[in-house]
């Protein structure tokens, strides 16, 4: 998983259960949910994700970097505040 977090340092140290929650709360399309979970939770390679969703690996990388992660980060303050309050 270290490779994934070098790409997205803001997500470093986020546990899998919280990453799943971020993906769901971001209200992504089904294809984007599959891309996000495959890369950010399961650390799959871009080529494997692309084969699963019918895109090439550079398109998957671009989608993750420009649309999916920014959308997830837009719900981050709400989620992180709720998680802190629950502790």
What kind of region is each of these model predictions?
Residues 25-33:
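Short helix-coil-helix linker/hinge
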Residues 32, 57-58:
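The DNA-contacting recognition helix of HTH DNA-binding domains
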Residues 35, 60-61:
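Helix-turn-helix DNA-binding helix
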Residues 36-43:
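Short helix-to-turn junction characteristic of helix-turn-helix DNA-binding domains
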Residues 48-53, 60:
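Short alpha-helical "recognition helix" segments of helix-turn-helix
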Residues 68-84:
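Short, Lys/Arg-enriched C-terminal cap helix and immediately downstream tail that follows
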């Amino acid at each position: 998983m270290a490779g994934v977090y070098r790409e997205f340092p803001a997500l470093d140290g986020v546990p899998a259960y919280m990453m799943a929650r971020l993906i769901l709360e971001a209200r992504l399309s089904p294809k984007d949910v599959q891309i996000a979970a495959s890369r950010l939770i399961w650390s799959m390679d871009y080529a494997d994700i692309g084969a699963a969703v019918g895109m090439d690996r550079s398109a998957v990388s671009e989608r993750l970097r420009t649309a999916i992660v920014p959308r997830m980060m837009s719900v981050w303050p709400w989620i992180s505040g709720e998680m802190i309050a629950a502790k």
